[in-house]
């Protein structure tokens, strides 16, 4: 077997993000890899991830309201604080070898931490309309995968040229 990897996954907000991430996490665990999640304890991932037997590194973030652009300032401040919290958690627990983002704003601090620290990350877009977080993080992704072929166009010119259609995991 290949080297066992330490994998950290960010997926949050809705079951549409979390359930595909949990399915992949279970497969990775079955193959001998160590898997943890980043998420919010007060959101759905705060219940589903521990119930599935995976550790959850807690962070607190929120999206912003595009009709009220000033909310982006508060959102950015929360992302920066969350990125710092992740840095401290990884200093204590060991940094991941690779990370995965399954969409939602909860992935942004993790994937920004990865970019800054040279840790490769992958994206998966399972929705019919790619979300803002995945679009923002695509430029530095090692690879992006999509559930639907039409979603590939959202990643054109961003990051790795060989994005793939995988369907939902």
Regions found by a protein language model. Name each.
Residues 44, 55, 115-169:
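Active-site-proximal region of nucleotide-activated glycan assembly enzymes
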Residues 17-28:
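Short amphipathic alpha-helix
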Residues 14-15, 19, 104-106, 128-132:
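Residue-level detector of alpha-helix initiation sites
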Residues 4-12, 31-81, 85, 161-169:
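Conserved nucleotide-sugar phosphate-binding/catalytic loop shared by glycosyltransferases and other
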Residues 85-100, 106-122, 135-143:
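Glycosyltransferases and closely related glycan-assembly transferases
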Residues 17-18, 45, 108-109, 154:
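Glycine/Thr-rich phosphate-binding loops of Rossmann-like dinucleotide-binding domains
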């Amino acid at each position: 077997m290949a080297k066992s990897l330490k994998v950290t996954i960010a997926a949050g907000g809705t079951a549409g993000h979390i359930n595909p991430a949990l399915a992949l996490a279970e497969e990775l665990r079955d193959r001998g890899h160590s898997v943890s999640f980043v998420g919010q304890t007060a959101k759905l991932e705060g219940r589903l991830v521990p119930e599935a037997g995976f550790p959850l590194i807690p962070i607190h973030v929120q999206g912003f309201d595009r009709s009220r652009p000033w909310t982006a300032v508060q959102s950015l401040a929360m992302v920066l604080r969350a990125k710092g919290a992740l840095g401290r958690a990884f200093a204590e627990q060991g940094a991941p070898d690779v990370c995965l983002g399954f969409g939602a704003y909860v992935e942004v601090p993790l994937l920004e931490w990865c970019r800054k620290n040279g840790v490769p990350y992958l994206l998966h877009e399972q929705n019919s309309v790619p979300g803002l977080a995945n679009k923002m993080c695509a430029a530095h992704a090692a690879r992006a995968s999509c559930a639907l072929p039409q979603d590939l166009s959202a990643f054109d010119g961003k990051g790795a040229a060989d994005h793939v259609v995988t369907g939902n995991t």
